[in-house]
């Protein structure tokens, strides 16, 4: 009886409750930890049951999950500008706003992706030494993550990227109150990747397919306040 079985059992009870003529709004799902919301949210979306999360964010809206997905996207596609911007200085590696502004302007002027613009600026040697070293370190990190995760299973790829990027270590060493919950969320993301059922018919490699799935999950709107929804 795993977490998915548990969530399916709860969903079956909710649907039976609804079939008996009761309202979804009379149902609340309580979970033991923040990370457990992921499997419930996934099943609710899959079955078209409206829901709303109270007292927190939905799984794929959490900052640490967005950071992790950005790393996975950038490893899969170097020209993903939103992902580049999100994690080029997460965890902090000395890439300041001025360097990022220079990078954006260079990319726009040359019609390049941020990844291409970064290589271009480094080859032109126009950046200050500290900024250049930080930028090169980030580019090298992404290339290393791609090389180290090549040939691994889907779950192992996610685990490798989360460890290799320093995200897991950063949150484990963080002293803020929510650090443990963030680590649990990242570990749950690895579980989500590991358990993802890839459909080769979609024409995508397994990781790209999972990332498309995650984008759909994140894009699903929560139920409106007036809707009859599970909470």
What are these regions (language model features)?
Residues 6-13, 67, 188, 231:
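Well-ordered alpha-helical segments embedded in enzymatic catalytic cores
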Residues 10, 29, 68, 96, ...:
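A residue-level signal for conserved active-site and pocket-lining positions in enzyme catalytic cores
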Residues 107-120:
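A short beta-strand-loop micro-motif that forms or neighbors metal/cofactor-
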